[in-house]
Amino acid sequence: MTNNLKVAVIGSGISSLTSAYFLNQKYDIKLYEKNDYLGGHSNTIDINYNGKNIAVDIGFIVFNHQTYPNLKAFFELLDIKIAKSQMSFAVKILEKNLEYAGTNLNSVFAQRKNLFKPAFLKMLRDILHFNKSASNLLNQGVDLNYSMNKFLQDLRVGNYFSQYYLLPMASAIWSTPLEKIGDYPAQSFVRFFKNHGLLTVSDQPQWYTVDGGSKQYVNKICENFSNKISLNDEVKSIEVLSNLNSRNIKIVSTKGEDFFDKVIIGAHSDQALKMLVNPTDLHQQVLGNIKYQKNLVVLHKDSKVMPQNKRAWASWVYTKYDDSQNSSNIFQNLPSNLAVSYWMNNLQNIDQNYPIFVSLNPKQEIAKEDIFHQKIFEHPIFDSQAIKAQSRMQEIQGLNEIYFCGAYQSYGFHEDGISSALRVLNQLYIKAPWQ
């Protein structure tokens, strides 16, 4: 049963889709999406690989039950089929001829020479030292100005640990250049690591992927309001009119204009700010203080992005190239210290006879005939300025009946997106069945 209030939902990532799914049960909604597909970072690409049809995700790929409780509950409500995934991490440093993975002892010492390398062995000891010290840090008072760089200096860990373990792993997780990771507030960084079981060698969570690709859940969510979705329809402006009548929020988009009582913006914070006509100082201070990093995502079949030593292959591979590796093709002008590849066969249980990879900002040349798809994604950079902006998000929620949701409000992951949507829904007196 719906009332006559009209609500606009802008964007179709997990935050917007969650909002629209539950708002549709109470209000008359309209969802705007500027792209020609729904899902935002949930982007499944259907490819033909030597005659075999394969669905591959290039954005959202995996989740677990412990640290994604709302996503787990939503998938169960939607009856989404999931499959176990295998999460592991590897590092490939070309200038040092260094390759290793954290899967097991055999992969840690994939290069047997590292058994006799003091710096590498110290790195392993530093991992244990960091894990213990990081847990202690969480018991101290919060200081957003205490950065990861300062924390690592205080721990006196070796360069191998910082440059070839911790910062590459974090860079891969947050899709952020290595040189910017050190600016992250240490406690926020460590809290994420602890919540995801990254401060312990044992007790790792079981990871899952959506069977058939993330498009399965996107399609299921949209079933009940497919006639209320406007694709290829970018919102140009959102203006709050001075009249006190109902539907006093005017939206101008690619396809025309419409009027609403409430608006939920699930776009990135910088995009949301640009949409607002005459934003308040509060909007500027909160939405304007989160920066974003452009990253090129390439879906391809070139196994050269993986370690040369097969023992060091893992689901996520961070690669650091030397300067001579920078190619002169479309991959130039990308973050100098961020190149990550995902082994999709391992992550999404794809037939190993069809090697398939997703690479973020690859520096080496990938033959055009090996590329299936490529796309630019933007990821938030969680420096101290962003963390402070996050803490003030509630100050702008509901101002002039405009609300904001998005994974940028926390750590940038799917659980953060859905959680932000639930906070907005709760403010509108709507609760999910599992709440």
Task: Describe the predicted segments one by one.
Residues 45-71:
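N-terminal glycine-rich dinucleotide-binding loop that anchors FAD/FMN and/or NAD(P) in oxidoreductases
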Residues 189-249, 253:
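Helical element adjacent to the flavin cofactor pocket in flavoenzyme catalytic cores
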Residues 15, 37, 270:
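Conserved Rossmann-like nucleotide-cofactor binding loop
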